[in-house]
């Protein structure tokens, strides 16, 4: 996949992505009915990977116009009809969506943006009860942040500076 040179763009490392999708396939062996969203799509690697593994629908949200154009070119090159690309602010876009819209949500904002907590707040109502939320951070995530959003880590790992977690909603 071609990558546009954008300041602050930090694609998920291949090793981390392989681990993540191994976890997802273990927890959700059949993705054929899954709907996914990547709130800070960047290169789109996570969303395109989810689509390639059979997800029914994947939405990529990105605010950077250069990246949106690149995502659109990649979608057409791959003939990935199950992918929707939305240009805009992820928090504003998701505010308009109905509850329980997604089985898989990717939240990987720029590390120092302060967007992780607001994104978790915005998506708490969007995830289905058995859904998965992936977060990627530059520092270990605080358990209090997860508890506030009624999430628990199903799997966690780190590779270098990248800390990554696959979260599930707590039962009501």
Where are the regions that the model predicts?
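Class I S-adenosyl-L-methionine-dependent methyltransferase catalytic core
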Residues: 1-172
């Amino acid at each position: 996949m071609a990558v546009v040179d954008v300041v602050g763009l930090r694609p998920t490392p291949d090793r981390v992505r392989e681990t993540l999708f191994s976890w997802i396939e273990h927890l959700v062996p059949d993705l054929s009915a899954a709907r996914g969203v990547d709130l800070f799509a960047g290169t789109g690697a996570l969303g395109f990977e989810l689509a390639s593994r059979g997800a029914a629908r994947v939405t990529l949200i990105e605010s950077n116009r250069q990246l949106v154009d690149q995502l659109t070119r990649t979608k057409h090159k791959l003939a990935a009809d199950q992918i929707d690309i939305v240009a805009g602010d992820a928090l504003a876009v998701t505010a308009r969506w109905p509850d329980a819209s997604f089985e898989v949500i990717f939240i990987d904002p720029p590390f120092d943006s302060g967007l992780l907590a607001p994104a978790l707040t915005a998506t708490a109502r969007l995830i289905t009860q058995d859904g998965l939320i992936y977060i990627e951070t530059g520092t270990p995530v605080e358990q209090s942040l997860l508890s506030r959003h009624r999430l628990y880590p199903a799997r966690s790992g780190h590779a270098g500076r990248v800390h990554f977690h696959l979260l599930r909603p707590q039962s009501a």
